[in-house]
Amino acid sequence: MPPTDSIHLIIHSPERTILEKMVCKVSFPGTKGRFMVLKDHAPLISSLEEGRIVFVSGGVEENIDIKTGFVEIAYNKVTVCVEL
């Protein structure tokens, strides 16, 4: 059975909202190393370094390259603020 898109991902930049969609997983370039978020991940706040945010929605892998940022994870909602 394929995973369901049950994580609400929102990516903001200082200029605009870049993306808002439901995903089944997302990985980030954390300053302490790359990490992945799946459904029901523990609450977390982390800084991000230059790299690629990779997420899967509807079985399709997509990505966004960033310079720096922060991510907050809580209750299947992932909010990201980045500079591109």
Q: Where are each of the predicted segments found?
A:
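Sequence/structural signature of small/polar-enriched beta-strand/turn repeats
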Residues: 2-3
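Compact, glycine-rich, soluble single-domain proteins
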Residues: 6-84
